[in-house]
Amino acid sequence: MAKRTQAILLLLLAISLIMSSSHVDGGGIAIYWGQNGNEGTLTQTCSTRKYSYVNIAFLNKFGNGQTPQINLAGHCNPAAGGCTIVSNGIRSCQIQGIKVMLSLGGGIGSYTLASQADAKNVADYLWNNFLGGKSSSRPLGDAVLDGIDFDIEHGSTLYWDDLARYLSAYSKQGKKVYLTAAPQCPFPDRYLGTALNTGLFDYVWVQFYNNPPCQYSSGNINNIINSWNRWTTSINAGKIFLGLPAAPEAAGSGYVPPDVLISRILPEIKKSPKYGGVMLWSKFYDDKNGYSSSILDSVLFLHSEECMTVL
């Protein structure tokens, strides 16, 4: 009996070690939160333990002398100071090891960079109001975010590389400032191509949707795999993520059924050493469709087949 118990314990230890090493080398899920008041709080989002990265969306007014403005849809009213409570959610996420970024831009808004000096002004604003600096008017309260996400979809195509350099330089003052980006899948991205060439970005979640030449369509994975390979071999970034809509209605096109992602696409993209996981738009649609729950284990582990072999 004792030998059998010992054998079972050794088997469980072996499984644990394999799963743990696979997870370390594997990926995670990034989610966009903030654009629907019915998607739950930031604290609730992170308490699901499904996400490794959360992008707060969006700071969609800034640059060219404008007073910066954050838009969190139905969650809170920043103009009345009603979003400072979000600091509680930020800290709750960070305690669990989840990185939280502020996302700049989005599909709708008034944002641009007019010059290198303008980029410096925006960087200073972000540092003082959301990162490690000091300001009496921090829109999300006193919590210090982990970094800044670039989701630039219109406006100027210039000076985003300067903004990245200025923000990255703040890492020298203590806590690292993570830089992330959500370019469109056509390569190179019109707005962020130059910025990504700086090599300063830690995580790049490419949007493989709303762009038929580089997305999944009707059973055909060739376009999305070819585009993935182009991105992973062409830019110098820490990790690259497969950006997808979390439900069919979350995007105009490019939705990938979970079974297709798990059986056909993930095995291909995991071959890249730059594989970081999957990005989903957005928390609201993920709640409706349960997408992250369907794919989580497959995203996390690089070598799930090894666990099956041991079992």
UniProtKB/Swiss-Prot annotation:
UniProt keyword terms in alphabetical order: Carbohydrate metabolism, Chitin degradation, Disulfide bond, Glycosidase, Hydrolase, Multifunctional enzyme, Polysaccharide degradation, Signal, Vacuole
Cysteine disulfide partners in this protein: 46-93, 76-83, 185-214
GO MF: chitinase activity; endochitinase activity; lysozyme activity
E.C. number(s) listed in UniProt: 3.2.1.14, 3.2.1.17
Propeptide, residue positions: 300-311
Range of residues in the leader sequence: 1-26
GO biological process: chitin catabolic process; polysaccharide catabolic process
Note, other: Two components of hevamine have been isolated: hevamine A (shown here), the most abundant, and hevamine B.
Functional description taken from the UniProt entry: Bifunctional enzyme with lysozyme / chitinase activity. May have a role in plugging the latex vessel and cessation of latex flow.
Family: Belongs to the glycosyl hydrolase 18 family. Chitinase class II subfamily.
Protein name as it appears in the record: Hevamine-A
